[in-house]
Amino acid sequence: MRTIEIFDTTLRDGEQSPGVNISTNEKVEIALQLEKLGVNRMEAGFAAASPGDQKSVAEVAKRVKNATVVSLARAVKDDMDKAYEALRNAQNASLHVFLATSPIHRQFKLNMSKEEVLARAVEAVTYAKKYFTEVQFSAEDAARTEIDFLAEVVEAVIKAGATTVNIPDTVGYMTPYQYGNIFRELKKRVPSTDLIRLSCHCHDDLGMAVANSLAAVEGGATQVEGTINGIGERAGNAALEEVALALETRKDYYQATTKLNLKEIARTSQLVSRLTGMIVPGNKAVVGANAFAHESGIHQDGVLKEVTTYEIIRPESVGFKSNKLVLGKHSGRHAFKEKLVDLGYHLEQEEVNAAFAAFKVLCDKKKEITDDDILALVDSKMVRGPEAFQLESVQLAYGNISVPTASVRLVRADGSVCEEAACGNGSVDSIYKAIDRATGEEVSLVDYKILSVTHGQDALGEVFVRLQQDDLIVTGRGVSTDVLEASAIAYVRAVNKIMERRGEPTPVSATI
């Protein structure tokens, strides 16, 4: 039975989803959960893309102990130097260097010949080996590269010292048979691939990223790259939870499995969804709300008699459990801290204190506190560091024959207070117009979503907003038992992100 290694790129490729902006602290929290999930490698970012990215990579590198932390880099010395600086304190570090190899990229993007591409690839890997024991080389758009030339590049970079070679389907163009065959051909043409990791990286433009990844495993790949929930640029990446469950459930066929702690999948999926603002569809395989639901009477009858009649995966095997009551208003700080550890959080004492204070406020509003309530509450408090504005209060005058009017009171970072009021086309619109007046920011609301965290009239409401200002798109999230307050919190946080990132240089984007 082969063991397939898992390379997670949620923090790099996943963050390139439109509108997704994850703060450094949020990246660290996701990284620690990925470590708990058991991924072999995690790509913390693209250190040379921006100062913010370099800081995020460095922070993740400091905190993660049991997985290899990776930074992406172009085949450029300055990129590799910055990656080395960011990863200097990592327990286990690796560089992921990439260069396009396909005819269309050579002609229109690089303006380089085959010989020049080959020489640049070897030069980059050779330079990277000065810094890193473990170096991964990706042949960008490998799936559309001539197989003879691809084999030549793979052989050359292995000889130069690459310990992993990645064969990405950069634009999600391949079919499973075609993609698997690339790996079979490389194994046949380049014997030295037996000495290194052969990795696959699939995009989902035609909806075949997971199928292609599994085909690569059949063809000889020993590492699968992807993201949690399949998030990523355009249509996204291969969903790692689907790949892992497919290998585990059908190991009789694939004769391969991973070393992931599958019971951490649900928690990891929920954390990534909350912090990115990307809602998991109900019918999403493995982690969707309906993944284990049965509505058909025939199916229900079968499941009641014998679960395996219609369930090939048990919800408990991926970490879903009954939403039992866990804490209440009489629960103490110690019990609350133990619950946070049980739920996978890694918080400093100051952060525990802040979360506990918010928990006590919630207990006064809600009779029954569940795991999901605590997850939503703590995740919503993960905005750390100074914010330009904080919401102190929101009031609304509303009736079916009057124009909705909202007034908001915001506190600036320096402690000063600003109050504004506005009328709007509905309660939420009036709140947002009042916040615009108070902050002085001109933004466009691109998307607004509201979810119920749990059930019942006193359930927490979770609001996600997406705002745009010029070319900058950000997300904000708010949680409260009052959905209008949650809406205001989400909007203010998104405005803060815009103000924080407006002066930053535009990050370099990279699609492998």
From Swiss-Prot:
Which BP terms from GO are recorded? Answer: L-leucine biosynthetic process
Ranges for domain Pyruvate carboxyltransferase: 4-266
Compartments annotated for it: namely: Cytoplasm
Q: Using the UniProt annotation, give all residue ranges assigned to the region (Regulatory domain).
A: 390-512
Q: Which residues form a coiled coil?
A: none
Q: Which residues bind Mn(2+)?
A: D13, H201, H203, N237
Give the top-level enzyme category. Answer: transferase
Q: What Enzyme Commission number(s) appear in the record?
A: 2.3.3.13
Q: Does the keyword S-adenosyl-L-methionine apply?
A: no
Task: Give a single Pfam family match.
Answer: LeuA_dimer
Q: What does this protein do?
A: Catalyzes the condensation of the acetyl group of acetyl-CoA with 3-methyl-2-oxobutanoate (2-ketoisovalerate) to form 3-carboxy-3-hydroxy-4-methylpentanoate (2-isopropylmalate).
Query: Any idea what this protein is called?
Result: 2-isopropylmalate synthase
Q: Which organism is it from?
A: Brevibacillus brevis (strain 47 / JCM 6285 / NBRC 100599)
Designated gene of the protein: leuA
